[in-house]
Amino acid sequence: MNADSRTRLNQRPEWTALAKHREELAGTHLRDLFAADPGRGAGYTLEVGDLHVDYSKHLVTDETLRLLRELAAATDVFGLRDAMFRGEKINVTEDRAVLHTALRAPRDAVVEVDGENVVPAVHAVLDKMSTFAERVRTGEWTGHTGKPIKNIVNVGIGGSDLGPAMAYEVLRSFTDRSLTVRFVSNVDGADLHEAVRDLDPAETLFVIASKTFTTIETITNATSARDWLLTELKAGQEAVAKHFVALSTNAEKVSEFGIDTANMFEFWDWVGGRYSFDSAIGLSLMIAIGPERFREMLDGFRIVDEHFESAPAEDNVPLLLGLLGIWYGNFHDAQSHAVLPYSHYLSKFTAYLQQLDMESNGKSVQRDGNPVEWETGPVVWGTPGTNGQHAYYQLIHQGTKLIPADFIGFAEPVADLLPGLVAQHDLLMANFFAQTQALAFGKTPDEVRAEGVPEQLVPHKTFKGNHPTTTILAKELTPSVLGQLIALYEHKVFVQGAVWNIDSFDQWGVELGKVLAKRVEPALTEGADVPGLDESTKALVAKYRQLRGR
């Protein structure tokens, strides 16, 4: 997009048409929309894979959706989508292709980067992962003392941690329960301390996830883990090769650490960290759930990839969800988006989406380097129902902010629940459906009065409703369904970035903090005079050193 005012997003006729339409809909209530269209509840739904997506409780009409699709066409969302799938370098600031979709491509697919088909390499790594995972799961792989591995500790940060940690929790009912799997990411030593304190080092395998093998937090934790292992085993460096594997591309650094490069699993610079857990980064997950179920998850990703690539605009679910976010963020001044899964197993799902969405679209500069003049990525937040109902739903129901929300639920409880707990699933889902109805339709003053409520309390017990929600419903939670859900949100984020004309695949804000931390550390440890520290930070460093007795 050019900097010329005629082509700026907020100057486009499609944008101004939406702004005018927003004014025309002001005062329209979801109660009115449903009254005008009795078939709305069934008509405003889409299907993709195993996911049933109900968007009837959104503040939209057929005209709204048409105008949003016109905006997508004007900003060439599908053109950028096609360029991504072709392997073009759409990450403009790093001159990289964006091909997380290749990680789940079938063996016979052809996806080229710089003229080379990357799919054979993807499947070679998957096959290598599968072989290793089975060796661990069957007990064939043993530690330094000959004991089989019973504990897996994944050491990474960001995309090397959030994805596999989330997926392990989501698919816990599919895991080998004889294995203990833990995740360490924080450079705070307490994280590693708590992860290993009750583990037998002779039965523990560390999976070190760092593409460059230089990520400071990860290598610091990996070094401490190595020290713990060798001290506890009273062993020499030769023990490392039986208890550590690497997810990396830096063979030299991996070898220097003591890891056998035969146990190094590679990935590529055309995979961003927050899109990487279906690559080698998912090794700890594959060990936990097994290669077959890991591939089922990849199949789920692919279902939505193919849908996003081929479905027409009016039936394209990621496009719809992305455009609904544009509608609220840019035309209703919504600052955040809640994702509320009604499944305990999805307890880390929203935290994963925080990185996916906020690191991708937390940008204020266009792809051409010009500043944006419109709102971009929202704050993404939420926790599983029904816990959130007793915490922050009050603000969604009766607060002053418009907060669009996604409700994710499943018709069947997981298969291995104790029989006495299965009946609770209906209560969980009763809350699921009740909340979206309450948010949409609220409770009028007359309805409150009809219950005999004293007049002075009527305003307090009135709910205006008109809070938009998407309901995503699947029969059951499976590896495939998890893949479908993640791909759905990946492509939703892509759509929004394309409309906003930002690079959704870099993360320069992350890099700045890393650089500054390296400069500040000597001031903490040695009292060094660090050039460029502001007066506030200098005073805080001095206070820190005083409290540490330095």
From Swiss-Prot:
Please indicate if the UniProt record lists Isomerase as a keyword: yes
As one GO molecular function, the record gives: monosaccharide binding
Q: What is its EC number?
A: 5.3.1.9
Keywords from UniProt, A to Z, are: Cytoplasm, Gluconeogenesis, Glycolysis, Isomerase
Q: Which GO terms describe its biological process?
A: gluconeogenesis; glucose 6-phosphate metabolic process; glycolytic process
Under the heading SUPFAM superfamilies, the entry gives: SIS domain
Active site annotation, chain numbering: E359 (proton donor), H390, K514
Q: Identify the enzyme class.
A: isomerase
Keyword set includes Transmembrane helix: no
* Pathway assigned in UniProt: Carbohydrate biosynthesis; gluconeogenesis; Carbohydrate degradation; glycolysis; D-glyceraldehyde 3-phosphate and glycerone phosphate from D-glucose: step 2/4
What protein am I looking at? Glucose-6-phosphate isomerase 2
Cite the source lineage. Bacteria, Bacillati, Actinomycetota, Actinomycetes, Kitasatosporales
